[in-house]
């Protein structure tokens, strides 16, 4: 494009190089071999010149004068200077990183910020305003192709717009790049461009409401509103978008703006409460504080100082490039233009102000408590006022939130840190939800009621991020970019490769999009990073470190993209690394779980939902907390809101975005940030290289290098490069452009692999085009120097020639002047000079007179023509008016037709939506039915559990009552003991009285007493030991008490769970009611759909009426056109008259001798006017004809379209009715299944009850043992008290030894009673152990049953494997039979594989382009319907064929009976049968293989189809494959027919060969003909014929003996005759078809017979030889008859084998059915096993629950024991008091010396026995305790074993389930094979029918052969007679 053309763009200097620059670049010195790029540490790459090359290394001098030495492979060549600042980098000769970098750098230095790189555009941020976006530039780019204009964002936008209009396809523009690269600005420019070129014009202004702008204004003003709340200052960018957006701009059918909508992604909500130092919060906060609108500050109760609010001044508060006050007014006016009400605006401002006040809330820690308390209420009151809340409730919710524990709400205390975190989370949530609400509100405004056809989506999203500290947000952004890059790769490189295929270049398709699939799968697939993160979020005890451990366990060392990072000192710690396409990124996982869960204070959220501020309550209206029930109506796939994590939401949004993008034609824009200092014109090479790698620009170049990036049309190539070798393309003769290019390239010294020839272009590898350019430049330089030399010589010669001519002319002039000077004064010459003027004046006067006359005549004619012209003009005006009226009418009709088309389109869309809704409703109905069944089952289960828990509660209450009774008994015992102590006190008083009397005796017994005291000391030591043992026992008792306390807690927990289950049952009942209501609604909706279909039918009839009206209108228009044509004919006549008159006038003028200049000009004007009128008339007629033709065509098209739509609607109605009936049937099936399930459940419940009864019995026994243990503990306490009392009595009162002995006897009795009780308890324990063993035995029995069932299943699997092996044997058998045609089958296989591969590629293309799927969807549905019809027909045909098969079997039996004795022709049918059977088996194998391929194809299709319904896709794909298989089958049938024809030819040849045994054939044919008429008669005729033949044989044998000499000669004659007979046979076969030919053949045979007669005359002796030969033939005949008998036996054997094969086929089908039934029984058994397993699990859970209950009871008993221990301590205190009294009274014991001596022996004996008993008792108790502990440990072990066993059972069930699935697959395959066998049987039947027809044909041919043989025999007889006559004559003559 020249500079003159570029001037239209206004800013040419910023868009493209000038011509001067281009010329300078071409003349700049450049050496292709020396000018290179070398790597550099600072600048990445620098330009250099090669100095030398040595040993694989290169020494080069850089531009800076620095000499470097690098490896040769690191050196990269520079492009020629003419490629500098090239607009499309894909056209560079050398495509590599430095070339791209320097091309961008040079362009950026000249402020050319836009560059193409193949299919996408690269833009660099200029950091300054450039005049490239004004209205002049917009107008220049409008309607321009990409190649016609310089690179620009407007060019991308206009191309997208033009593609949308021409291709009728949605478009998208993907703008990506890092923060500060200019994404937002380019997005604005794209929207600005569309708003200008596609403005809806006057109509939008008419529709404009006061206070609101036009649609294009609203689209433009949506940006300021979103930027105020979504943009902020960052380190790199003052106006950085902190969210991604996808703006869809919708257009009508004519390309006018219709509406728009916006989707947003990944808002950075953490910025609301935290900013880095060099950054700041969202713009809206600072705009409000700018004090531009003071009323806002008053309304929000804030100041204009940002430092007064904690959330917003953490970084910077002002930005030099942004005026916050002006931006506030822009935001406010944008709200007005977008139609926000004042209430909505104020609500937004209030919530923003409330967030600022949130940051100022202060809390303090309460003293001595971990509880936060408010520190002032001013900010809380302000924020509560702005949010429409109660301040006290808000504070209470912050400090004391309510948490749901079980079924109850509990108030939880919060510390200061927790409260501040909750405030931040609430502020972020409010801001995020407010931003999302704003987006939906803007979308509602941009949604107009105008019809919309297509849209262009603009995606502005953050680019790839690699920071020092990368967290969860970076993972989400990088994952998004990974998906987008994969989409970009697929689109770009698939298009590139499609062009190669289109051009016919040999190219193996490379799917570059899969390069990134490993990383994408690592992030999003199940058990990968995202799913593990979501799983960890569900566990309460999970932490970031457990998340890290799971990641390492699952992926470290298993995935190449997952790596362990290298932590560097001074940098943030990294936990794992991911290898992305842009580089390896280290991620830090701290806080990921919290970020993903994003929890909120639900108490405060509840307040928000009740807020008086309408906007706030709406924002949180749909919020459901962690304790809220899951919404069942949305199906199982939806999780509850508690599990709607950030990662899940992000993936859902990303999947929606990708589906949107896949349905469009994408255009890519890559934005690049040149430097981080925001300096204009400066480019930081390493930064730009990093972005180029991240943006995929270099990736695109890498893939581009694999292909052919440079391509030129053949004509252009020939024109441009013919100069390289003109001799290759001769000048004189015509040569095609392609052939010329081929010849030219082959003549050059170039590697042929570097270029390829397409259909229209020649393709070059990267670098070759630059080489050609260099060669062309060299050639041009040589040619130009030669031309310059020649031109200089030519110019000098021309100059010399001019000098010579000038000299000659000067000589001539000189000669003439000299001559004139000689005659000048001559008198006659003077006279001549005077007379010459007078002669001309007379002639001029005559001419003037004639011209005046002519002028008068012309003037009159002119006046007449003027009047005529005026009349014609008036008529023309009237005609033009009529034409305009007609055009208006046509326009109105076109508008009506367009409206009708739009309505039809809307109807089609409604139909599609209805179908989708019906599918959704059916799916939801199925899901709800499943949920209903599950809920009913859960409800019943919970009811059973409730009843069990109630029983447990009753049992616990009984045990409590018993315990209370025991407690009362112990209290009574304590009272009795206190009374006994009082009695002892009285005894002590009496003893004090006796003390005085005994003092004297005491003095004497002191010595003896000392000895006794020593003994007592030993006793006290033994007592201490016993007490220690007692303490140990008490410790064990305390442990038992703790266990009992735990059991009590578990019991309380169970009670809470019971309440929860009851509540959940209530909820489930409510859900059930809701489901019933939804079912009713669905019925109502179905009725509504039927009504809607009827309405659509009515609408169709209305459209038909309208069509009739339009037809009538068109007929009227045609009549008007006819009238206009007649008028046009009249005008044509007038025009011809005028032209005649004009010609006459012109002739007159010519006769008059010409006219004046005025008349000539008038004539010219009139002619021009007449020509103009003529042209106008012709144009008008052409326009009328064109409009009429267009109207007719449009009418026909509209009629056809409306008819198709009506047919489609009728089909839809029928389909809906079918689906309705199918749904009803499915409902009936579901109800029957439900009844069966209910019955099975009732049986299971009965079994559960029996087991529960047994468990209750065991439980009661366990409780009895517990009670006995409690009794033992109480008795042990009593023993301890008694032991203390005994010791005290021994020490204090020796006088009361007799009483102690009595007490001892009572205690011994009590001990014996205790022993008896212990023995009873041991017995009870033994019984319990027996019961436990029996229960274990039952469990073992159940386990054995389960193992038996598994063994049975294994046996079934063995049977199935045997069946499979049999099938495999059959297959191998068939394969061995089919060896003869393996090559053909392999070819068929290859064809099939190729077709399947093509189908797979088609499926991939379909997956990649969902839009094309949408178009083909209707066609596929029609094909499916046709297939269904074909299937029904084939079923009917199959039934008919079954009937034919039975009839055919009968016919075969009859034919077999008829032709058992004589069928020599069956040999051919046997061969045919063999070949057909082999073909059948081959077809069968091929069909089985095709079925296997079909199955694999189905599975792949299921995986690939995500959004289109699986059913339609599978049917479509199977339909395609079935069509292909039918084609293959037809091909194979054609081959079979060819083989049959070949067999027929073989049969014919066999007939020729059997000419030797004509008599045997004659006999056979006679027998066969007789069987057809009457078997009996033919038998008789055969016998007579045999007798005749025997007579002839006898006569011939008699003559044989005499004629032995001439045998050799007769043999020769016989051979000759056989040849003649063969010729006759051939002629006779032709005689069947044509009678005339038959007669000719008879004549030829007669002539041949005459010849043979002459030969026989010559050789009389040959007759006898012939007779001898005939005898030999008779013998051969006999032999052949024997062979025929053998062949019949073989045929019978083959028939039997065929029947056996059929029988085996039937048996295999029966086996398949048996296997199917076994499979169903296995499935039922599996269901039973699952039910048993679930029952066992429930039982185990109940046992565990009972153990917990028992533990709780034990804990309760321990508490009671603790109380009793306290009472014991009190008693011990009293005993200590008594001991003190004893010490005081020891002095009084002297008097009791004598009694002490007596009592000494008794005391010693009794004490020892008592001690021995106590020790024995202690040992028994210890043994019992150890046994009890052992039992407890065993029970724990048993529990663990049972748990392990349960896990094993679950694993086994899972394996069984998998095996069953495999069995199901096998059964399905077998069923498919059975169907294939059925089809093959049908095909065999068809083949049998064809064989039967062939047999009849052969039979007919045999009849004809019989006739021919009869004729031949008669002729032979004649010959014999003649020969005999001749022989007789010869004998007579002799």
Swiss-Prot record:
Residues 839-1934 form a coiled coil. It is found in: Cytoplasm, Myofibril; Cytoplasm, Myofibril, Sarcomere. It comes from the Eukaryota. SMART domains: MYSc (SM00242). It comes from Mesocricetus auratus (Golden hamster). Residues 654-676, 756-770 are annotated as: Actin-binding. It holds the Pfam family Myosin_head. One of its GO terms (molecular function) is calmodulin binding. InterPro entries: Kinesin_motor_dom_sf, Myosin_head_motor_dom-like, Myosin_N, Myosin_S1_N, Myosin_tail, P-loop_NTPase, XRCC4-like_C. The gene is MYH7. This is Myosin-7.
């Amino acid at each position: 494009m020249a500079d003159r053309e570029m001037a239209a763009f206004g800013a040419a200097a910023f868009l493209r190089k000038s011509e001067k620059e281009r010329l300078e670049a071409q003349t700049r010195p450049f050496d292709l071999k020396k000018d290179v790029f070398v790597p550099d540490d600072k600048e990445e790459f620098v330009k250099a010149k090669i100095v030398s090359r040595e040993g694989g290394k290169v020494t080069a001098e850089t531009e800076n004068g620095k000499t470097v030495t690098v490896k040769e492979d690191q050196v990269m060549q520079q492009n020629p200077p003419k490629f500098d600042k090239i607009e499309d980098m894909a056209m560079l000769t050398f495509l590599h990183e430095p070339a791209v970098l320097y091309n961008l750098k040079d362009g950026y230095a000249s402020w050319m910020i836009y560059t193409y790189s193949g299919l996408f555009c690269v833009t660099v941020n200029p950091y300054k305003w450039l005049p490239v976006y004004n209205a002049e530039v917009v107008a220049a780019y409008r309607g321009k192709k990409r190649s016609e204009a310089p690179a620009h964002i407007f060019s991308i936008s206009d191309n997208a717009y033009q593609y949308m209009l021409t291709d009728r396809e949605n478009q998208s523009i993907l703008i990506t790049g890092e923060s500060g690269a200019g994404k937002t600005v380019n997005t604005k420019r794209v929207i600005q461009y569309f708003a200008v070129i596609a403005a809806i014009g006057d109509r939008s202004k008419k529709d404009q409401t006061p206070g609101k702008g036009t649609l294009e204004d609203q689209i433009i003003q949506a940006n300021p509103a979103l930027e105020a709340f979504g943009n902020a200052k960052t380190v790199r960018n003052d106006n950085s978008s902190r969210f991604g957006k996808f703006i869809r701009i919708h257009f009508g059918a004519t390309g006018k703006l219709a509406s728009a909508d916006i989707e947003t992604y990944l808002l950075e909500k953490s910025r609301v409460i935290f900013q880095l130092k060099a950054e700041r919060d969202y713009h809206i906060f600072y705009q409000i504080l700018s004090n531009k609108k003071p009323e806002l500050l008053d309304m929000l109760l804030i100041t204009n100082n940002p430092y007064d609010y904690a959330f917003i001044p953490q970084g910077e508060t002002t930005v030099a490039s942004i005026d916050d006050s002006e931006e506030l007014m822009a935001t406010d006016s944008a709200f007005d233009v977008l139609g926000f009400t004042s209430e909505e605006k104020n609500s937004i401002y209030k919530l923003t102000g409330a967030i600022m006040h949130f940051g100022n809330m202060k809390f303090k820690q309460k003293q001595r408590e971990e509880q936060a308390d408010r520190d002032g209420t001013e900010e809380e009151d302000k924020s509560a006022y702005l949010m429409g809340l109660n301040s006290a409730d808000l504070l209470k919710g912050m400090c004391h939130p309510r948490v749901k524990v079980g079924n109850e709400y509990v108030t939880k205390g919060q510390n200061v840190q927790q409260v501040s975190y909750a405030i931040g989370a609430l502020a972020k949530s409010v801001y995020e939800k407010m931003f999302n609400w704003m987006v939906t509100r803007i979308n509602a405004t941009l949604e107009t009621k105008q019809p919309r056809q297509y849209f262009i989506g603009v995606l502005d999203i953050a680019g790839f991020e690699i920071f020092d500290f990368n967290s969860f947000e970076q993972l989400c952004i990088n994952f998004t970019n990974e998906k987008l890059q994969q989409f970009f790769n697929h689109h770009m490189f698939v298009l590139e490769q499609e062009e190669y295929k289109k051009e016919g270049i040999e190219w193996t398709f490379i799917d570059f999009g899969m390069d990134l699939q490993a990383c994408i799968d690592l992030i999003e697939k199940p058990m990968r990073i995202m799913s593990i993160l979501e799983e960890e979020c569900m566990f309460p005890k999970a932490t970031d470190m457990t998340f890290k451990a799971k990641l390492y366990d699952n992926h470290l060392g298993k995935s190449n993209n997952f790596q362990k990072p290298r932590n560097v000192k001074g940098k943030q710690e990294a936990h794992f690394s991911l290898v992305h396409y842009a580089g390896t990124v280290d991620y830090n996982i701290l806080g990921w779980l919290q970020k993903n869960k994003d929890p909120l204070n639900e108490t405060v959220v509840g307040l928000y939902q009740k807020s008086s501020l309408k906007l706030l309550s709406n924002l949180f209206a749909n919020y459901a907390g962690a304790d809220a029930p899951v919404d069942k109506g949305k199906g199982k796939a939806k999780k509850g809101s508690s599990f709607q994590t950030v990662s899940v939401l992000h993936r859902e949004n990303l999947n929606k975005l990708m589906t949107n993008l896949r349905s469009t034609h994408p255009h890519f824009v890559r934005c690049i940030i040149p430097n981080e200092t925001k300096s204009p014109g400066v480019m930081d090479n390493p930064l730009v290289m990093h972005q180029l790698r991240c943006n995929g620009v270099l990736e695109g170049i890498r893939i581009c290098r694999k292909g052919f990036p440079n391509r030129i049309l053949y004509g252009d190539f020939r024109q441009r490069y013919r100069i390289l070798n003109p001799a290759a393309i001769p000048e004189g003769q015509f040569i095609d452009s392609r052939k010329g290019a081929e010849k030219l390239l082959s003549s050059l010294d170039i590697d042929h692999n570097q270029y390829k020839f397409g259909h229209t272009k020649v393709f070059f590898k990267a670098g070759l085009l630059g080489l050609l350019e260099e060669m062309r430049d060299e050639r041009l330089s040589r040619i130009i120097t030669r031309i310059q030399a020649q031109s200089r010589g030519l110019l000098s010669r021309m100059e010399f020639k001019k000098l010579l001519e000038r000299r000659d002319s000067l000589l001539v002039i000189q000669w003439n002047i000299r001559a004139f000077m000689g005659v000048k004064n001559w008198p006659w010459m003077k006279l001549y000079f005077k007379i010459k003027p007078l002669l001309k004046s007379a002639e001029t006067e005559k001419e003037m007179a004639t011209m005046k006359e002519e002028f008068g005549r012309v003037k009159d004619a002119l006046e007449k023509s003027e009047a005529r012209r005026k009349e014609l003009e008036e008529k023309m005006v009237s005609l033009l008016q009529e034409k305009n009226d007609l055009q208006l009418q046509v326009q109105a009709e076109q508008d009506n037709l367009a409206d009708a088309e739009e309505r039809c389109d809307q109807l089609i869309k409604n139909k599609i939506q209805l179908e989708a809704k019906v599918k959704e409703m059916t799916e939801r109905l199925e899901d709800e039915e499943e949920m209903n069944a599950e809920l009913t089952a859960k409800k019943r289960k919970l009811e059973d559990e409730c009843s069990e828990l109630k029983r447990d509660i009753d049992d616990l209450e009984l045990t409590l009552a018993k315990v209370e009774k025991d407690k009362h008994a112990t209290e009574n015992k304590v009272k009795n003991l206190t009374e006994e102590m009082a009695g002892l006190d009285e005894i002590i008083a009496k003893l004090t009285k006796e003390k005085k009397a005994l003092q004297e005796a005491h003095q004497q017994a002191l010595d003896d007493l000392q000895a006794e005291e020593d003994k007592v000391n030993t006793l006290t030591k033994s007592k201490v030991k016993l007490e220690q043992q007692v303490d140990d026992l008490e410790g064990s008792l305390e442990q038992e008490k703790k266990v009992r306390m735990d059991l009590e807690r578990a019991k309380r927990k169970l009670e809470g769970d019971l309440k929860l289950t009851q509540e959940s049952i209530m909820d489930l009942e409510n859900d059930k009611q809701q489901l019933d209501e939804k079912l009713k609604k669905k019925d109502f909706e179905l009725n509504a759909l039927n009504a809607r279909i009827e309405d659509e039918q009515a609408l169709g009839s209305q459209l038909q009426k309208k069509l009739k009206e339009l037809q009538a209108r068109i007929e009227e228009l045609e009549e008007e056109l006819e009238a206009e044509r007649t008028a046009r004919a009249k005008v044509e006549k007038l025009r011809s008259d005028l032209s005649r008159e004009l010609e006459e006038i012109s002739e007159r003028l010519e006769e008059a001798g010409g006219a004046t200049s005025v008349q000539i000009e008038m004539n010219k004007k009139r002619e021009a006017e007449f020509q103009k009128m003529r042209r106008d008339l012709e144009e008008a007629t052409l326009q009328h004809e064109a409009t009429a033709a267009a109207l007719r065509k449009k009418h026909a098209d509209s009629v056809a379209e409306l008819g198709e739509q009506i047919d489609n609607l009728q089909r839809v109605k029928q389909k809906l009715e079918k689906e309705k009936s199918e749904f009803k049937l499915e409902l009936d099936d579901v109800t029957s299944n439900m009844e069966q399930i209910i019955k099975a459940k009732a049986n299971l419940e009965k079994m559960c009850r029996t087991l529960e009864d047994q468990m209750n019995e065991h439980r009661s026994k366990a409780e009895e043992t517990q009670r006995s243990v409690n009794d033992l503990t109480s008795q042990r306490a009593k023993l301890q008290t008694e032991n203390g009392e005994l010791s005290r009595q021994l020490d204090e009162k020796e006088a009361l030894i007799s009483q102690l002995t009595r007490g001892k006897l009572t205690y011994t009795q009590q001990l014996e009673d205790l022993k008896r009780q212990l023995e009873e308890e041991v017995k009870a324990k033994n019984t319990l152990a027996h019961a436990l063993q029996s229960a274990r035995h039952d469990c073992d029995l159940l386990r054995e049953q389960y193992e038996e069932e598994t063994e049975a299943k294994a046996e079934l699997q063995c049977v199935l494997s045997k069946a499979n092996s049999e099938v495999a044997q059959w297959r191998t058998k068939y394969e061995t039979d089919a060896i003869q045609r393996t090559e053909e089958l392999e070819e068929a296989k290859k064809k099939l594989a190729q077709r399947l591969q093509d189908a797979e590629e088609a499926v991939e293309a379909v997956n990649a382009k969902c839009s094309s799927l949408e178009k083909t969807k209707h066609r596929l549905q029609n094909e499916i319907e046709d297939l269904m019809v074909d299937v029904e027909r084939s079923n009917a045909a199959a039934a008919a064929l079954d009937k034919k098969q039975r009839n055919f079997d009968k016919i075969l039996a009859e034919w077999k009976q008829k032709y058992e004795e004589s069928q020599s022709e069956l040999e051919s049918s046997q061969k045919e049968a063999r070949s057909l059977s082999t073909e059948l088996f081959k077809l069968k194998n091929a069909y089985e293989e095709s079925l296997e391929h079909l199955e694999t194809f189905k599975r792949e299709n299921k995986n690939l189809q995500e959004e289109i319904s699986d059913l339609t896709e599978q049917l479509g794909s199977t339909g395609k494959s079935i069509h292909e298989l039918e084609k293959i089958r037809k091909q194979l049938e054609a081959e079979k027919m060819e083989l049959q024809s070949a067999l027929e030819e073989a049969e014919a040849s066999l007939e020729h060969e059997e000419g030797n045994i004509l008599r045997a054939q004659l006999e056979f044919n006679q027998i066969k003909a007789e069987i057809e008429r009457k078997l009996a008669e033919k038998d008789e005729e055969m016998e007579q014929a045999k007798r005749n033949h025997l007579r002839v044989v006898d006569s011939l044998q008699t003559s044989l003996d005499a004629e032995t000499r001439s045998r050799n000669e007769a043999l020769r004659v016989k051979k000759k005759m056989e040849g003649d007979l063969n010729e006759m046979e051939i002629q006779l076969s032709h005689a069947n078809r044509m009678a005339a030919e038959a007669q000719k053949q008879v004549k030829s045979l007669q002539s041949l017979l005459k010849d043979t007669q002459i030969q026989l005359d010559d050789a009389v002796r040959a007759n006898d030889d012939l007779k001898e030969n005939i005898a030999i033939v008779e013998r051969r005949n006999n032999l052949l008859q024997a062979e025929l008998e053998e062949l019949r036996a073989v045929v019978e054997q083959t028939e039997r084998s065929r029947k056996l094969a059929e029988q085996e086929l039937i048996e295999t089908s029966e086996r398949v059915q048996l296997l199917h039934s076994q499979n169903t029984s296995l499935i039922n058994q599996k269901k039973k096993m699952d039910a048993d397993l679930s029952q066992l699990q429930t039982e185990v859970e109940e046992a565990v629950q009972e153990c917990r209950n028992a533990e709780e009871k034990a804990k309760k008993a321990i508490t009671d024991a603790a109380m009793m221990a306290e009472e014991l301590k009190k008693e011990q205190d009293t005993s200590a008091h008594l001991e003190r009294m004893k010490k005081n009274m020891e002095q009084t014991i002297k008097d009791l010396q004598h009694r002490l001596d007596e009592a000494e022996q008794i005391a010693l004996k009794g004490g020892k026995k008592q001690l021995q008993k106590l020790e024995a008792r202690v040992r028994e108790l210890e043994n019992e305790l150890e046994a009890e502990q052992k039992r407890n440990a065993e029970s724990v072990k048993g529990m663990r074993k049972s748990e392990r066993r349960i896990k094993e059972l679950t694993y086994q069930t899972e394996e069984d389930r998998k095996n069953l699935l495999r069995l199901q697959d096998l059964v399905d395959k077998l069923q498919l094979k059975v169907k294939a066998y059925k089809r093959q049987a049908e095909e065999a039947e068809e083949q049998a029918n064809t064989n039967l027809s062939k047999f009849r044909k052969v039979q007919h041919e045999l009849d004809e052969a019989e006739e021919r043989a009869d004729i031949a025999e008669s002729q032979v007889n004649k010959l014999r007679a003649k020969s005999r006559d001749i022989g007789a004559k010869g004998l007579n003559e002799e």
